Curated annotation (Swiss-Prot):
Zn(2+) binds at residues 37, 63, 105-106. Pfam families: NifU_N (PF01592). One of its GO terms (molecular function) is 2 iron, 2 sulfur cluster binding. This is Iron-sulfur cluster assembly scaffold protein IscU. It comes from the Bacteria. Keywords: Metal-binding, Zinc. InterPro entries: ISCU, NIF_FeS_clus_asmbl_NifU_N. Its cofactor is Zn(2+). The keyword Zinc applies. Forms a heterotetramer with IscS; each subunit of the IscS dimer contacts an IscU monomer. Upon overexpression can be isolated a monomer, dimers and other oligomers. The gene is iscU. Belongs to the NifU family. Binds 1 Zn(2+) ion; this is probably a substitute for Fe-S centers.
Length: 126
């Protein structure tokens, strides 16, 4: 199985690795995956007063495709509204990274993680 140059680039030079303060009311955290079997993805967003994502961070434990999917989605959501970010589909991530069929589940984790982070942020807002 050969990885695309984009997967290799995001794996070797991941963007936005780290974490934001979970206690901050403007930070939403999404944690998805199965710790017992491998891939786990934590994705966090920081939302400004206008509902625009101003920062995004991730920590992913998994294969190169999972890390690349996390890195890519954190780049994509910055500057987007919650609605725009929530509309990102795993198929867009898989297509951009040219993921092989056996790695498409990694892009699904990224889609699930951003949706979970948005839901967490909205829950904090009441």
């Amino acid at each position: 199985m050969a990885y695309s140059e984009k997967v290799i680039d995001h794996y070797e030079n991941p963007r936005n690795v780290g974490s934001l303060d979970k206690k901050d009311s403007n930070v939403g955290t999404g944690m998805v995956g199965a710790p017992a079997c491998g891939d786990v993805m934590q994705l966090q967003i920081k939302v400004d007063d206008n509902g625009i994502i101003e920062d995004a961070k991730f920590k992913t434990y998994g294969c190169g495709s999972a890390i690349a999917s996390s890195s890519l989605i954190t780049e994509w959501v910055k500057g987007k509204s919650l609605e725009e970010a929530g509309a990102i589909k795993n198929s867009q991530i898989a297509e951009e990274l040219e993921l092989p069929p056996v790695k498409v589940h990694c892009s699904i984790l990224a889609e699930d993680a951003i949706k979970a982070a948005i839901a967490d942020y909205k829950a904090k807002q009441g």
